[in-house]
Every structure is written in C-alpha cells, then in structure tokens.
Regions:
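Flexible "arm" and connector segments at domain edges
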Residues: 1-54, 58-84
Length: 84
C-alpha cells in the first residue's frame, strides 16, 4: 500500500474514533508510551515487536500532527532540508 493511502486510512480511522478531536496531550503521551515499548523491544532484540512499536509510534505521530496543526509532510521536508 502506498504511503499516501495509508495516511488517508489512518486519518479516517482516527476520525471514526473521535481521536482527531482529542486532547493533543493524550496523543503525546501515547507517543511516549510507544517509544517506551520500542525501547524495550530494541533492548530485547525482538524484531516483530520493534516493527509493531515503530508502526504504532508513526500512527500516533501522524495523529498528533493533525491535532496540533502541523503538516507532517512539511515537517519531514523541513527536517530533510536541514540535514541535506
């Protein structure tokens, strides 16, 4: 599946659950939780759990971006422009 299609599906999923109208602090805490899970999976060298945690972290980050009015594409582009 193409990234843009995934983004649209994630956006719809969040909307269907009302997450797109949630308090951004809640989604920020979700990102922290997922980062903790990723850290644990990495430390245990558990690849499948790392894949799951990375995916969950990306979903949470995309939703957080929407909640705080940051275009995720613009953000990654700006980051790339700083490192290139």
């Amino acid at each position: 599946m193409e990234y843009e299609d995934l983004f649209k599906k994630i956006t719809a999923w969040a909307h269907d659950r009302g997450i797109d109208q949630a308090d951004p602090r809640v989604e920020f805490m979700k990102m922290a939780e997922e980062l903790g899970e990723l850290s644990a999976a990495y430390n245990k060298e558990h690849h499948a759990k790392m894949v799951d945690s990375i995916g969950d972290l990306q979903v949470a980050l995309l939703i957080f971006c929407q909640l705080v009015g940051v275009d995720h594409k613009e953000a990654i582009e700006a980051a790339y422009n700083q490192i290139k």
